[in-house]
Amino acid sequence: MEKAATVLGLTIVRIPVVATETVDWDAALKRAVAAKVQALVTAPMTANYDITDKLAAYATKYRLPFMHDVPQLARDALAVYGPDFEDIFRRAGHYVARILKGEKPAMMPIEEPREFRMIVNQKVAKALGLTLPYTIILRANEVIE
């Protein structure tokens, strides 16, 4: 992400989070607004899934594009790009079948996600006064109107 930001002339403002339960989100997000951020992007970590609604509400309040990596939580984000969890769960079933047939879990390779989903939200774009490029819309797996 750092390289891409540099190439595009962007600056990344980080809001470090160790444990979501102990973070004062209002203070953290106010720091982001004070830093004049122009978008919110969450890091791909499960700790962020519980606060997606809060981040989306904050992004809406301050008219910031919000992007994250959980396709199942796409309704309030401008864009989502992340692993296809349905595919991951199907793959998990294959692992279970292999274990039930006697294969040792310690000897099985770890798999990374094979499929990713991109969802763009035209409704959010319109509310923010943005027009999504046609090339992005064409690449999206789903477009929310």
Locate each region found by the language model.
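Short hydrophobic alpha-helices and adjacent helix-cap/hinge residues
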Residues: 1-145
